[in-house]
């Protein structure tokens, strides 16, 4: 069986020591087999040399079969191979044919197949092992002006570490000195560097490209982003899909069944011929068919290729910055027909910006300038948006007599003129007639020197590729898209219409979102799965309640990594459709392998039972099918162009 573990020391696709030893054994066996066929040695010496060759190529299989028998786990592929090959030896001795080639060939090609699948698994692990390379080996701890290299586990919260160019960021923290560019590709799949400067948060696992950074740590290594991600990936193999569980249960029933069937094939027809038909029993013919039947029946194509397909799919997704917590979630994701979004941070940037300016006799730039100056003392998000739109340093000497009226706005003198900045209530308080605005967003009205000057529209900005992301979801097979938001109905409906979202539910509190998701779950069929996409902030209850929770833009968000089933490391909504496409490709490959292996196996079993298929045919039906299935499985790694 395939063990879905991660080898952190894996480098590239080279063979490991065990694989090299197996290759040497295979080559020695081939040389000996060719020599024995050319030399035509006879008698006991010939048998002895073939047995030596058999032990060289098959001693590990013999050992595993013996351990299985001692542990009362008899029926596995090792047992099948041992019975088939020893039976072939016994049959050759009984017939005095001295042709032991088939017995050796069965074990030889089985081992070639095992080596191939081992190498394929190693190659498929490459993507996840590259992700494992984000684990930092050390941290440069700065104490009393001296830098010492220590294990990241030894660094306490609040310590200062130095990250040199080319080094991995070992712990999460805040930059207190320096600026640089970070390579985040191992985390997000994004090839473009991310620029950082003093005051920016920085997460572990990124690679510092050029500048020297001093970082004040905010988390211990065990709680850092890199540790959370590594734990997530390493545990992904423990969560089995229904397909994998089916194959495991199938193998437990199938292998004993074919063993007893082979025994029946070896005994019943000869006995029927002898006692009921008065014919020669031909035990050698039926035993040969039974041995062929056993070789064909080996289920390794299924038990290897199915988990390998999921492993490759998870590995390919991780390379694109999509972390799937297990093959069960990959399978559920492939069945997603309804996608519900939390609007803020997923479809929109979650950052308020000035989206429109409507003025009376004052130009746009001056209206924004007066608004920003009047709001200079406020820390409200609306004030920040106005100051950002102004884009210049605030000259506070131009502003006096600032008065903030809670829930309404701000009064101030700017350059000696009375300025009022706020909502409709503030205009009504000052008895200043104002114009209603029908655009979605927050409307900031302005009056200067007692006269209405216009209004500024501030809204949450829709991500540039959000509409394309919705379209891609439809192409990926999603039947319905839904937007859940706490925004006002009018603003929510305008965003939904802009993005072509099918349904929108607005003015929802966090608890209301959970109730709405439960309502949506009860209204769908069991075969359809509902995915909820959030940014991980206050979304944990909904992420866990949906059939599958997807956290987007989760770099540095512990809550998202903990609560979600699928974690998208950047905030690109296009990744949602990509994740679904990857899951569909992976499941398609799984079903292809299951159908292909079963059809070929049962067809060849029938041919073996009636005597059409010989041992060489059986070798192809076993090893050939496994090789084809494994080659198909590793296609799940290729996901970049989806």
Placement of each model-derived feature along the sequence:
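Juxtamembrane coupling segments of multi-pass membrane pumps/enzymes
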Residues: 10, 79-81, 105-165, 196, ...
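Conserved ATP-binding TGD loop and adjacent catalytic N/P-domain core of P-type ATPases
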Residues: 416, 442, 448-592
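Conserved cytosolic catalytic loops of P-type ATPases
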Residues: 130-223, 328-371, 413-414
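Transmembrane helix-loop-helix hairpins at the membrane interface
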Residues: 13-138, 240, 249, 256, ...
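Helix-interface capping motifs at the ends of transmembrane segments in multi-pass membrane proteins
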Residues: 31-48, 55, 67-78, 82-103, ...
